[in-house]
């Protein structure tokens, strides 16, 4: 049953059901991932009976997501995809000067966790994406001649709240499919402890990013209600265990909100949170993120000088920290801005 859950498992089963040799499945996946063929009818190396069965089961195209709107800036491209049931999600492609291409994909339609500073949460939660819908976002970019150099689960939704996440990562790292290294994938979380623990066991080399945004339990609970279920102190213990087990760095995202979490007291509390945790504490890295304004929230953008001062306080205390370079904010494609705006 598990084998046939995703489209690739179903394709393999289809080859078997038609009593075709196993190499036909290999030909199919090579046509998709080596030759970038998106139309089943165009995979002429396959027998007509198999091509017809594929079209009947999946439709004409390999990728099931349909782009209905796109918006471009100098280094970012935001796409609004429509799914087969009419729901919509957004994904973002980023291109760096060196030619490196990175893609930010969604794991849910909307989000139900209600982080106060995030536009996605204002849309509410509609449903989880399937593993195929998650990976098909990348297939679209791939079929349009983009290089999938790195992937981040930082689009719409909380990745660890979707049980299909790990099937999607399995597809992405399958050497016969996308063939991505685990280290090219980053999963961002607001602190879902069971999800972090499962990642540690199943995909220890996948990068992990944790959304902190306040070092104080009470304020974090106000900004991010999930903190009431998974308190910061417990999340940090889980992150310690992740680092000890994997030897991998954990990235801690901290959105700078003017007058909310940007004080010297906050910076010193972040230092206190990360210092004296153990011999592994150097593997925590703070990623300071300038707030991206939206019409869904009332928070204000923090000045660059204040952010630099906050960063300086962290560095002087021996904390690894950088200020994130933002791309795509002018087209509402940056952190916290994805919210179906273009479907209205």
Swiss-Prot record:
Its EC number is 2.1.1.224. Binds 1 [4Fe-4S] cluster. The cluster is coordinated with 3 cysteines and an exchangeable S-adenosyl-L-methionine. Residues 97-330 form the Radical SAM core domain. Signal peptide: none annotated. One of its GO terms (biological process) is response to antibiotic. [4Fe-4S] cluster binds at residues 111, 115, 118. GO terms for molecular function: 4 iron, 4 sulfur cluster binding; metal ion binding; rRNA (adenine) methyltransferase activity; rRNA binding. One of its GO terms (cellular component) is cytoplasm. S-adenosyl-L-methionine binds at residues 157-158, 188, 211-213, 292. Specifically methylates position 8 of adenine 2503 in 23S rRNA. Confers resistance to some classes of antibiotics. This is Ribosomal RNA large subunit methyltransferase Cfr. It comes from Clostridium botulinum (strain Loch Maree / Type A3).
């Amino acid at each position: 049953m598990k084998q046939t859950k995703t489209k690739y498992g179903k394709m393999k089963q289809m080859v078997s059901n038609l009593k075709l040799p196993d190499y036909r499945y290999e030909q199919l996946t090579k046509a998709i991932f080596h030759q970038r063929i998106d139309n089943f009818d165009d995979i002429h190396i396959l027998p007509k009976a198999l091509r017809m069965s594929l079209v009947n089961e999946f439709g004409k195209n390999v990728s099931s997501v349909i782009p209905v709107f796109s918006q471009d800036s100098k280094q970012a491209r935001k796409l609004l995809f429509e799914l087969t049931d009419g729901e919509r999600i957004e994904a973002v492609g980023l291109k760096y000067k060196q030619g490196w291409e990175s893609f930010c994909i969604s794991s849910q339609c909307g989000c139900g966790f209600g982080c106060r500073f995030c536009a996605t949460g204002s849309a509410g939660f509609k449903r989880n994406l399937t593993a195929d819908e998650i990976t098909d976002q990348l297939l679209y970019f791939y079929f349009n001649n983009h290089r999938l150099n790195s992937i981040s689960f930082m689009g719409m939704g909380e990745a660890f709240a979707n049980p299909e996440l790990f099937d999607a990562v399995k597809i992405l790292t399958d050497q016969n499919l996308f063939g991505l290294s685990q280290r090219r994938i980053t999963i961002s979380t607001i602190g879902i402890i069971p999800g972090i623990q499962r990642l540690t066991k199943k995909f220890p080399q996948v990068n992990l990013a944790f959304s902190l945004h306040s070092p104080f339990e009470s304020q974090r609970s106000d900004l991010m209600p999930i903190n009431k279920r998974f308190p910061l102190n417990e999340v940090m213990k889980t992150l310690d265990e992740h680092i000890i087990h994997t030897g991998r760095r954990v990235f801690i995202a901290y959105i700078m909100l003017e007058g909310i979490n940007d004080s010297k007291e906050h910076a010193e509390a972040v230092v206190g949170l990360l210092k004296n945790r153990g011999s592994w504490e150097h593997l925590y890295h703070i990623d300071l993120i300038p707030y991206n304004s939206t019409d869904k929230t009332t928070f204000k953008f923090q000045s660059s000088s204040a952010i630099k001062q906050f960063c300086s306080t962290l560095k002087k205390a021996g904390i690894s920290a950088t200020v994130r370079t933002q791309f795509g904010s002018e087209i509402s494609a940056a952190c916290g801005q994805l919210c179906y705006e273009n479907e209205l």
